[in-house]
């Protein structure tokens, strides 16, 4: 069973926010949750090594974040199974295996997109996790790697991981990945998008649940993809222009609600900010995720500038945001 949202008959995976390294941390996810009650949120990729050997609590999250999925990076079935059990015990709603990140530091650890070249190992990893948890185990991948970019290669990968790994849900980034020669940023922009190939994959594997990811910039585009796919995952646009999430519950999930007011969202962050600051957090680490909230609204530039210049100062607290809001209110 996939996690369902609290107030909708539609599954949470219908619309999700992509796992993004250095971006979708727990502060970011708490903020995004205030914009949409329904959207499925993903953590940044967390490696099995960090969870098993790291000194920090890499599984920390706020209860308010649900539904929330943990994305794991790794390629050792036993270690992945161990981490999946820990994550389920902590209350995560889904475990996702990263088979799409092309970063050099990821390849060196033998996980991410390079795993696409070893479908049997991916199947073994998924099966090991499925055997020890009852929550969904999903895979996020690309449509190919390097010169292994034929449709037959992609189908063989899906066949192996769904058949032998018993994976029932895939999130497909509609680009291939170059494992050398391109930076992670270039790998998100240079390989061309091929949405029709992902649509065809869903038609050829109708029994599997599939979400599409890559280059999606509006809810209108998301709704078009949902004519072909089970779910849509949005990445950079949702981070850089989070205001688009204000209408997700109504437009994507059919909820009988009014769209979220961004000013109210900012003020709803104040108790969280006060709590985090009291535990040693730094305001700038929270507000950096909120800079794009008013994109397209008069005063947005002043909002960004004020936060950027003041959130890092000693003693900065929620009053900084309240002052920044006046720059928006003056323009409304």
UniProtKB/Swiss-Prot annotation:
Q: Which InterPro entries match?
A: Aldolase_TIM (IPR013785), DUS-like_FMN-bd (IPR035587), DUS_fam (IPR001269), DusA (IPR004653), tRNA_hU_synthase_CS (IPR018517)
Q: Which CDD domains match?
A: DUS_like_FMN (cd02801)
Recorded catalytic reaction(s): these are: 5,6-dihydrouridine(20) in tRNA + NADP(+) = uridine(20) in tRNA + NADPH + H(+); 5,6-dihydrouridine(20) in tRNA + NAD(+) = uridine(20) in tRNA + NADH + H(+); 5,6-dihydrouridine(20a) in tRNA + NADP(+) = uridine(20a) in tRNA + NADPH + H(+); 5,6-dihydrouridine(20a) in tRNA + NAD(+) = uridine(20a) in tRNA + NADH + H(+)
The EC designation for this entry is 1.3.1.-, 1.3.1.91
* Positions of the record's site feature: Interacts with tRNA: 98, 185, 188, 301, 304
Enumerate the PROSITE patterns for this protein. Answer: UPF0034
Q: Which domain of life is it from?
A: Bacteria
Instruction: Give the molecular function GO annotations.
Output: flavin adenine dinucleotide binding; FMN binding; tRNA binding; tRNA-dihydrouridine20 synthase activity; tRNA-dihydrouridine20a synthase activity
- Top-level EC class: oxidoreductase
Active site residues of this protein: 101 (proton donor)
Co-factor requirement: FMN
Q: What keywords is this UniProt entry annotated with?
A: Flavoprotein, FMN, NADP, Oxidoreductase, RNA-binding, tRNA processing, tRNA-binding
Q: Which residues bind FMN?
A: 19-21, 71, 140, 173, 213-215, 235-236
For whether the record's keyword set contains Lipid biosynthesis, the answer is no
Q: Which family does it belong to?
A: Belongs to the Dus family. DusA subfamily.
Question: What is the protein's known function?
Answer: Catalyzes the synthesis of 5,6-dihydrouridine (D), a modified base found in the D-loop of most tRNAs, via the reduction of the C5-C6 double bond in target uridines. Specifically modifies U20 and U20a in tRNAs.
- List the HAMAP family: DusA_subfam (MF_02041)
Q: What is this protein called?
A: tRNA-dihydrouridine(20/20a) synthase
Q: Lineage of this protein's species?
A: Bacteria, Pseudomonadati, Pseudomonadota, Gammaproteobacteria, Enterobacterales
């Amino acid at each position: 069973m996939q996690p369902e949202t609290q107030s909708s008959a539609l599954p949470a995976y219908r619309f999700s926010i992509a796992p993004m390294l250095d971006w979708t941390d727990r502060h970011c996810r708490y903020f995004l949750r205030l914009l949409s009650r329904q959207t499925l949120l993903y953590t940044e990729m967390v490696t099995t090594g960090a969870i098993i050997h790291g000194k920090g609590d890499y599984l920390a999250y706020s209860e308010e974040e649900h539904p929330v999925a943990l994305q794991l990076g790794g390629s050792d079935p036993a270690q992945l199974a161990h981490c999946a059990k820990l994550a389920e015990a902590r209350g995560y709603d889904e475990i996702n295996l990263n088979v799409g990140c092309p970063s050099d530091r990821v390849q060196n650890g033998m996980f991410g997109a390079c795993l696409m070249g070893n479908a049997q190992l991916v199947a073994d990893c998924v099966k090991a996790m499925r055997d020890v948890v009852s929550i969904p185990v999903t895979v996020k991948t690309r449509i190919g790697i390097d010169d292994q970019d034929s449709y037959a290669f992609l189908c063989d990968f899906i066949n192996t991981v769904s058949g032998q790994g018993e994976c029932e849900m895939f999130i497909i980034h509609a680009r291939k990945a170059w494992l050398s020669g391109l930076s992670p940023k270039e790998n998100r922009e240079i390989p061309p998008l091929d949405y029709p190939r992902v649509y065809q994959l869903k038609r050829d594997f109708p029994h599997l649940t599939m979400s599409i990811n890559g280059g999606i910039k509006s809810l209108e585009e998301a709704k078009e993809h949902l004519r072909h796919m089970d779910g849509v995952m949005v990445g950079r646009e949702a981070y850089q222009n989070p205001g688009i999430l204000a209408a997700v519950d109504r437009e994507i999930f059919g909820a009988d609600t009014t769209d979220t007011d961004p000013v109210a969202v900012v003020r709803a962050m104040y108790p969280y900010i006060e709590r985090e600051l009291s535990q040693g957090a730094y305001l700038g680490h929270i507000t950096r995720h909120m800079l794009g909230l008013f994109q397209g609204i008069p005063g947005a530039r002043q909002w960004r500038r004020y936060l950027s210049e003041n959130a890092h100062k000693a003693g900065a607290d929620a009053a900084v945001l309240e002052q920044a809001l006046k720059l928006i209110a003056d323009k409304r």
